[in-house]
């Protein structure tokens, strides 16, 4: 196993522990708590994949961080912070919408890269909107936290979420996953639109009808994908 992979996991475990202590003092805002919960799932998945104990890794990560801080001068810290571009956290969904449990009458699941796509194939003839919480850097989607499909009545009928055991995805991965979800929902004559915020930072454009600018070739490919899996 690569030593950098292990040490990266150890540091991530310790930093999560620090953030958890911060949250326990009721100091974290909603985006902070949301990332904390999802990072916990990711760490559990990575720990299982790597065969490493999280508690042991946390202690090792603490030693690594303490060693770095001992060598770090205040001036170097200021320069590092100034040179790192800041990302923004954007929310289409409330914390309640993100944390709400939902159930599928006819569940369908597909894995696309490091993203998991879930939808309820029992949903027909509905108007559906896709809403997401994600981070943005350089005016482009950086990391998808969670995307969910809602009916006009507020029911959740679909979802795209990162796989805890496979961290890391690009905006192109998110575009493709959204296309698969749209194709699956439209197969049952549902009308799907994407939130303006998600359109703007994923495709850098927005349409009044809420349709992302998918090229015809990609639309046909996604339709065939859904048809072959139904």
Curated annotation (Swiss-Prot):
Motif position, Nuclear localization signal: 34-38
Keywords from the UniProt entry: Eukaryotic host gene expression shutoff by virus, Host cytoplasm, Host gene expression shutoff by virus, Host mRNA suppression by virus, Host nucleus, Host-virus interaction, Inhibition of host innate immune response by virus, Inhibition of host interferon signaling pathway by virus, Inhibition of host PKR by virus, Inhibition of host pre-mRNA processing by virus, Inhibition of host RIG-I by virus, Inhibition of host RLR pathway by virus, Interferon antiviral system evasion, RNA-binding, Ubl conjugation, Viral immunoevasion
Region (CPSF4-binding): 180-215
Record PTM: Upon interferon induction, ISGylated via host HERC5; this results in the impairment of NS1 interaction with RNA targets due to its inability to form homodimers and to interact with host EIF2AK2/PKR.
Motif residue range(s): Nuclear export signal: 137-146
Gene Ontology cellular-component annotations: host cell cytoplasm; host cell nucleus
Pfam family, one: Flu_NS1
Annotated protein name in UniProt: Non-structural protein 1
Gene encoding the protein: NS
């Amino acid at each position: 196993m690569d030593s950098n992979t292990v040490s990266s996991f150890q540091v991530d475990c310790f930093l999560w522990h620090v953030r958890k202590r911060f949250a326990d003092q009721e100091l974290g805002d909603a985006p902070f708590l949301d990332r904390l919960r999802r990072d916990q799932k990711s760490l559990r998945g990575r720990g299982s994949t790597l065969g490493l104990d999280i508690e042991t890794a946390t202690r090792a990560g603490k030693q690594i961080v303490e060693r770095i801080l001992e060598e770090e001068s205040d001036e170097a810290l200021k320069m590092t912070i100034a040179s790192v571009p800041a990302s923004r956290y954007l929310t289409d969904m409330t914390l309640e919408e993100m944390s709400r449990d939902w159930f599928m009458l006819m569940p369908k699941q597909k894995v696309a890269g490091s993203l998991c796509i879930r939808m309820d194939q029992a949903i027909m003839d509905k108007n559906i909107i896709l809403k997401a919480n994600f981070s943005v850097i350089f005016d482009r989607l950086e990391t998808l936290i969670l995307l969910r499909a809602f009916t006009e009545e507020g029911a959740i009928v679909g979802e795209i979420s990162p796989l805890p055991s496979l961290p890391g995805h690009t905006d192109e991965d998110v575009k493709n996953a959204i296309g698969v979800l749209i194709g699956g929902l439209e197969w049952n004559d549902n009308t799907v639109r994407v939130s303006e915020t998600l359109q703007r930072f994923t495709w850098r454009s927005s349409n009044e009808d809420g349709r992302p600018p998918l090229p015809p070739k990609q639309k046909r490919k996604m339709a065939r994908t859904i048809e072959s899996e139904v």
